Every structure is written in structure tokens, then in C-alpha cells.
Swiss-Prot record:
Protein's recorded name: Asparagine--tRNA ligase
Enzyme class: ligase
Alphabetic keyword roster: Aminoacyl-tRNA synthetase, ATP-binding, Cytoplasm, Ligase, Nucleotide-binding, Protein biosynthesis
One Pfam family in the UniProt entry: tRNA-synt_2
Subunit structure as annotated in this protein's UniProt entry: Homodimer.
The UniProt record lists the keyword Cell wall biogenesis/degradation: no
Family indicated by similarity: Belongs to the class-II aminoacyl-tRNA synthetase family.
GO molecular function, one term: nucleic acid binding
Residues forming coiled coils: none
InterPro entries, per the entry: Aa-tRNA-synt_II (IPR004364), aa-tRNA-synth_II (IPR006195), aa-tRNA-synth_II/BPL/LPL (IPR045864), Asn-tRNA-ligase (IPR004522), Asp/Asn-tRNA-synth_IIb (IPR002312), NA-bd_OB-fold (IPR012340), NA-bd_OB_tRNA (IPR004365)
Annotated catalysed reactions: tRNA(Asn) + L-asparagine + ATP = L-asparaginyl-tRNA(Asn) + AMP + diphosphate + H(+)
Subcellular location: Cytoplasm
Amino acid sequence: MSIASVASVFKGEHAVGSTVTVRGWVRTRRDSKAGISFLAVYDGSCFNPIQGVVPSSLENYDNEVLKLTAGCSVIVTGEIVESPGAGQAYELQVTHVEVTGWVEDPDTYPMAAKRHSIEHLRELAHLRPRTNIIGAVARVRNCLSQAIHRFYHENGFVWVSTPLITASDCEGAGEMFRVSTLDMENLPRTSDGKVDYDKDFFGKEAFLTVSGQLNGETYACALSKIYTFGPTFRAENSNTSRHLAEFWMVEPEVAFATLSDIASLAEGMLKYAFDAVLAERMDDLQFFAQHVDKTVIERLQSFVSSDFAQVDYTDAVEILQKCGREFEFPVSWGIDLSSEHERYLAEEHFKAPVVVKNYPKDIKAFYMRLNEDGKTVAAMDVLAPGIGEIIGGSQREERLDVLDMRLEEMDLNKEDYWWYRDLRRYGTVPHAGFGLGFERLVSYVTGVSNIRDVIPFPRAPRTANF
């Protein structure tokens, strides 16, 4: 008995006439007056289910096959034949059906054939992978993550596992989840009435990380080229389609690199990942183009064939001020560009992905390298047509005196960053890196606009089920 995935059958990896066994779940059952049933069986290996043609001569045809409904799990054995119908190249002439799991009450099964709204599916996150849309998102997400790992491996990067529990605030934003084992009903107090974190598990305040960057820099300053790829956390009370409390970040860090170097790295990585999806997951992309966003395939093809534009923040502000468009948020030098500004630049002005660089220092983090003008830092955002900002990065401040000045300006205690400052004391080196919000990337590739639908179990304000 040869076990086959549905994808391997459709790819022609098994000869016509050979017998294979497919294990999966029933999507639909259709019965013919000619005494045969058609089972659509999917196993998640590709978008389309395979059709099994089941004759009534099977001994369990009446008492089992005719009772199969959407969601039942089955093991189906049959001969691969060329399909006479349109839509798929092969089907199975079934010789054996084993039912491994029934759906208790088909009338109340939440994932029955009828279509559900994407909002309703969020309430059923444990079952939604069974739907066409979430299954397709999962395969594209996997393809993108595998491609990103391949890209960095092929380019000589070392993958570093940075800690999820930290004592430092990388962004200086303060919106962090506290990690504590203290009894909330009976908190220990210091003499001045504050919570005594000396009595806590780590002997100090600890938080879930907002970024692996600072830890990543320590390894880049020894191994030259590293990247992190893992979960990060923001206790930002934003209930929007663009925010999650827990999400994944890709963060490369490169020693002896400038802002220009990492802009090129970002372009190379994105194009590599998009090429992989176009090559490997066209079945899923066709579904998204048909049911979610008709431009997804064309958008990715255009992205990989376009050269990235580059513009200084100061020039971008001037472009926005002179374009004649009335924005919801007025543009002036010193503001952080909003999504409408970013999308205008990428979609209407440059009509290509664009790198905006050299932002005002007052709207950027303490670790970004101060430029010679004393007003801007060597920071960049990569803006993509259709979504806006997809990557944010910078050259890091490698000069200890300037770093200390920036920490002071932002009211951050330099003693908390003693180990980060050590990197500047012992063989300091220019270095640079960026962060890619992985869910935002998946959203861009699939056209699925709400970021809560591109991560298996979304975590957001008042949302931590499953």
C-alpha cells in the first residue's frame, strides 16, 4: 500500500494505473443514480481535494459511504486514473473506504459546506483551518517562512534564537507585557510602598520582548551576519485590523553594514520570498485572486520585477505637500508618515516599492545612528504598493558617546542597557538591521486584509481564546 498526499497525485508523482491510499477529510459527497458516489477528499497538502469515485459494490457502501458528510475523516484506497471531468488531471477509482472519524451531528457541524464570514470564523479558530481560505493562508504562510530561512541560509546568515523574556525595552515605548510569578492578591511591597520585584522569579522586573534586535546585535558583532525569526509582543491597546498583541518578526542584523546595505538586503529577501510563493503556491494564489483580492498575483509579479525607489524623508514630505491631495492627516516635517501617506508614495507617485530613509530623530528609537545634520537618523521604511510600510530598519548607533546622549534625551536609564553599551566599548563596528512584521507580509501576499486572519490563533485586546 502506497500512502500518497493529494498534492503528490496531482503533481504526477504516482503513475496512472497505480494504487495509492489517500488519508484526509471529506469536503463533499455527491451520489449518482448510476449507483456510484463521488467523494471530494482533502488532506491540506494543496488547495484542491481529489475526487474519489466510489462504486456501490463496496461492502460498506450503504451503511457507511452513503452516510459520509463534510468533515468526516477517511482512508481511501484506489487506482489513479485520468479524470474525464474538467478541473483536475487525476481522480481515484476507489476500491476501499475506511471511515476513521464521524461528524457527530452534521446539521450543527460549524464547518459544513455553507460559507461563513471571516469574522465568524475567528470565533472558531480551532476549526477554521478546515476552510478553503484559512487552509490556503496556512500553506502560504509556511511557504514564506521556509523561503525566508532559505534566503538567509543561502546568504551565509546564522539564525539566532533571541529570548522572549527580557528586562529591556527595545523600542523605548513602554507598551510591554509584564512577566511575574508574584501573588497578585498579596504583592510584596518595599518600604516606600512600591511592588518589590526583588521577590519575583527573576529578582527584577521582566517583560515579554517587543523585539529580538538588541540581543541580535550582540551576535552580529561576533558572527557578522545573523537573523532572528520568532514571536514578539506589544501591549498596545489597538483593536484594529493591522495590530496584534503577539506576532512574528524577522530581524536580520549585519556587521560592517550601512543603511544602503540593508535596503538592498530587504529588497533581495522580499523578492526571493515572493518568487517562492509564485512558484510553489499558485493554486492558493489563484483562490485568493478569485475570492479575496483579484490583484494578488499581478501585484506579486509586479513587485519582483520592479526596482525599489529610494527617497529621503525630507523629499517625501515635500512630494506629499505638493501633490495636491488632501490627506486626512496633514503632512509636515517631523511627523511620522501615516498609512495614507505611505500608500500615496508607493502606489501613485513612485508606482513601485519605495525605501523612505533619514527620518527625524525625534520620532525614532534611541539606537538609530544620528546623521551628520544632527536632526535625522539613518532609519528606513520599506513601503509596498497596496499596504504601505512592510519593513522598518536602521543603521545602529555604534558611537558610545552619541548612544549615551540619545538614551539621556529619551529618559532611558543607561544602566539598564549596560550590556548593549559594552558592544560599543569593545571593538565597536558600524552595523545595521531591520524588522519585518511577518503577519503583515502574509497579509500582503494573500490579500487577506485583517491581520487576525493570517495567524493561527490571534492575540489582541480582550482576545486570548484557544
